[in-house]
Amino acid sequence: MSKVTVVGAGNVGATCANVLAFNEVADEVVMLDVKEGVSEGKAMDMMQTAQLLGFDTKVVGCTNDYEKTANSDVVVITSGIPRKPGMTREELIGVNAGIVKSVAQNILKYSPNAILVVISNPMDTMTYLSLKSLGLPKNRIIGMGGALDSSRFKYFLSQALGCNANEVEGMVIGGHGDTTMIPLARLATYKGIPVSKLLSAEKLQEVVASTMVGGATLTKLLGTSAWYAPGAAGAFVVESIIHNQGKMVPCSVYLEGEYGESDLCIGVPVILGKNGIEKIVELELTAEEKELFAKSAAAVHKTNEALKEVGAL
């Protein structure tokens, strides 16, 4: 019996749970929320689509009842307030740090062997907070950001090329933020052909720029954070772990010398499997890419310092 818990039944959490159920990633999906009735109602709504969509995953909703999350294999943490228009990810720290820390501690009381997938923002910092405050091995704490950013990168590449997004390969590393992510245009391909041979340098730079502000663009349009792609990205990471797929996915993970950086969680390609992070993949970066990664890491370090300022670490 495989079991996944999603903490936070808001837009992102509910989307993640729905994708997990529809794709039958686990036998049971539990949604937990602090607001009375929300997760129960959404779980019931999802279960009433089972005969329409043809899945048999059991979806359970509960209000702050962590006992119902017991023995989860993977737990997705989406808790926290969403980013409002004009709000920086850094401004979220004061509120979300306390929420994420409390959630993670409660989860581990009932699922001490769970692998944690963090979606809460600022994601790199919340992943780092979880790792530092819980004392778990680093393979069991994973930030989702790179999976989402890479999907957005592939979307914008496919739009520029006029092709199916599933035929494009592209990767984003670095921090999960508008100014810290690094879309690796040099390595992007369409059916094995370097995209740089198909798009002008100017057009490729437009794609990179659109990717970097992808989240902010949606926030302006929606008036709140996006949820379909973030929820699906979380489910994608969970499926890679639960089904031991060995996929290479960019995720925010704890570095200890890899890419010349230490004591932070930041987006790099990893192999995901039943143990969570099976391996960190070190790419051969150009001098320019190395410089961008170092700047991104410095920005993430600076954001992490706020954890001490608010007393979270």
Swiss-Prot record:
A single MF term (Gene Ontology): L-lactate dehydrogenase activity
Known catalytic reactions: (S)-malate + NAD(+) = oxaloacetate + NADH + H(+)
Residues binding substrate, per UniProt: R83, R89, N121, R152
GO biological process, one term: tricarboxylic acid cycle
Binding site for NAD(+): G8, A9, G10, N11, V12, G13, D33, N96, I119, S120, N121
Pfam families according to UniProt: Ldh_1_C, Ldh_1_N
Keyword Protease: no
Record key words, sorted: NAD, Oxidoreductase, Tricarboxylic acid cycle
Function comment: Catalyzes the reversible oxidation of malate to oxaloacetate.
Protein name in the entry: Malate dehydrogenase
Source organism of the structure: Parabacteroides distasonis (strain ATCC 8503 / DSM 20701 / CIP 104284 / JCM 5825 / NCTC 11152)
